[in-house]
Regions:
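Glycine-rich Rossmann-fold phosphate-binding loop(s) that bind the pyrophosphate
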Residues: 3-9, 27
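N-terminal FAD cofactor-binding segment of flavoenzymes
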Residues: 14, 34-83
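Glycine-rich FAD pyrophosphate-binding loop
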Residues: 16-45, 346
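Short beta-strand to alpha-helix junction loop
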Residues: 48-49, 95-114, 172, 249-250
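Helix-loop-beta segment of a Rossmann-like dinucleotide-binding subdomain
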Residues: 86-105, 109, 142-144, 241-243
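FAD/FMN-dependent oxidoreductases across multiple families
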Residues: 102, 246-330, 334-353
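Predominantly flavin-linked oxidoreductase catalytic cores and closely associated redox partners
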Residues: 118-264
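C-terminal helical "tail/cap" subdomain of flavin- and related membrane-associated enzymes
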Residues: 332-447
Length: 447
């Protein structure tokens, strides 16, 4: 297993059931890590497992949800305890029965890693560089990986029946495959020019009430956004988002002024009297990238790719860790079908599985007129329709739940085009939904 972050850990837990030995190789000191690691620069920022991600994580690692709950990891109902706002209008609060896991990336990763560490057939190779894949050209097979201690020393070959690349967006597998004669890996990308700036605070007010996060989401009309999440007790983390090259300020005064410019007052009201904890951290995400391994004419046996090494998503949609769990489940299903592992079959199955999340992320980014990309008539229609749906969902808990189940990757995107949903959108847009009447011009308030 190349890489021991979330994607590598979920996949390692799966592989440990079917293989006699699983070795996780990572450039960082990962065992016992309680703070964001150098190899995971996005780890400073607010993270979460979407509703479907929580369900899949529990399926992959039984008991994980209760373990995190016992440790105080923030969790809440997708529609009842997460405060979502679009264009200054809060989605109607609605209990969905679906759990979202939030908070600190290092803490979430640590809980999954502790379960992998306790498996009797797993081993961590820390502070180790991955030099190259080992390839048997005669048989068209990856047979292992060459590694080297980060501090220097001799290279070593780790032989393996299966090598899984979970090294993230900087994966070198496309370069290695091309050098081995398998051709160039094509990719799809959408440039969004996103920047996160994150700070942590100690709150002096009850900003959350019974909620666990406050999420005014960026839109073309209001391109500044934020994710304010409880970290337990009186601590919170807040990630401000800027797109198309805008960078939220890192200085405290500028940071607070940015929150005041958001279309809802909740985040600013929570932070204006809060105590800052440490300095701000910024992270740039230029583009979503989907690597199309399934389109290669030839693939070596003994190789799989998971996580951001396979597909990176605009992080404002919160899909990354959920997709890591999904791909681990695809890997499990491919290994457990009773036949020899087929990379082609795996990559095709993984591509099909991530398609809904990719369509949501790319479609959302293409709603911004400045983002370059092909806008089919369907994409234009869907983005206009979703704008009206979110507007109507301010007054309609059923619409809010339908929308959240889709962005939570529980239901397929087509569910929002069902006749019953479309009728409620029309009523909410042109005639009022009849639910929470009179709230159409209100804005979200803290508490």
């Amino acid at each position: 297993m190349l890489g021991a972050s979330i994607a590598g850990l979920f996949s390692a837990h799966v592989l440990a059931r079917s293989h006699s030995r699983v070795v996780l190789v990572d450039r960082d000191e990962v065992v016992g890590a309680k703070r964001p690691r150098r190899g995971v620069p996005q780890g400073h920022h607010v993270h979460g497992l979407l509703a479907s991600g929580q369900l899949m994580a529990e399926d992959l690692v039984p008991g994980l949800t209760q373990q995190m709950l016992d440790a105080g990891v923030p969790m809440g109902d997708l529609g009842g305890q997460l405060r979502w706002s679009f264009n200054g209008r809060r989605l109607a609060s609605t209990r969905t029965g679906l759990v979202v896991v939030g908070g600190d990336r290092a803490v979430l990763e640590g809980h999954v890693r502790s379960r992998v560490e306790h498996l009797p057939n797993t081993e961590f190779r820390q502070a180790t560089d991955i030099v190259a894949l080992v390839h048997d050209e005669a048989h068209g097979r990856v047979t292992g990986v060459r590694v080297q201690p980060r501090g220097g020393g001799s290279e070593e070959v780790l032989s393996a029946d299966l090598v899984v690349d979970a090294t993230g967006r900087g994966s070198r597998t496309p370069v290695w495959l091309e050098s081995m004669g398998y051709g160039r890996v094509s990719s799809d990308s959408v440039k969004i020019g996103l920047t996160y700036t994150t700070r942590r605070f100690r709150l002096r007010n009850d900003a959350f009430g019974n909620d666990v996060s406050v999420n005014p989401v960026a839109t073309p009309r209001h391109p500044r956004g934020a994710f304010l999440t409880t970290l337990g007790g009186d601590r919170c983390g807040v990630s401000l988002t800027g797109v198309l090259g805008e960078t939220p300020p890192s200085d405290l005064a500028g940071f607070l002024e940015y929150t005041r410019s958001l279309p809802v007052p909740d985040v600013y009201e929570a932070l204006r009297d809060a105590e800052p904890l440490g300095d701000a951290i910024s992270f740039r995400f230029p583009a979503s990238v989907r690597r199309r391994y399934e389109r290669l004419r030839r693939l070596p046996t003994g190789l799989a790719v998971v996580g951001d090494a396979l597909c990176t998503f605009n992080p404002v949609y919160g899909q990354g860790m959920t997709m890591a769990a999904l791909q681990a489940r695809v890997l499990r299903d491919q290994i457990g079908d009773g036949t020899e592992f087929s990379p082609r079959s795996y990559f095709r199955a993984a591509s099909r599985a991530l398609e809904p999340a990719w369509s949501i992320a790319v479609g959302g980014d293409l709603a911004f007129p400045e983002v370059q990309g092909r806008r089919t008539p369907l994409i234009r229609f869907v983005n206009a329709y979703l704008d009206r749906l979110r507007h109507a969902a301010h007054d309609d808990p059923r619409l809010a739940e339908a929308f959240l189940r889709v962005i939570g990757l529980v239901d397929a995107p087509e569910r929002l085009l069902a006749p019953g949903v479309a009728l409620r959108v029309l009523r909410g847009t042109y005639g009022g939904s009849g639910e929470r009447a009179g709230a159409r011009t209100g804005v979200s308030r803290a508490g």
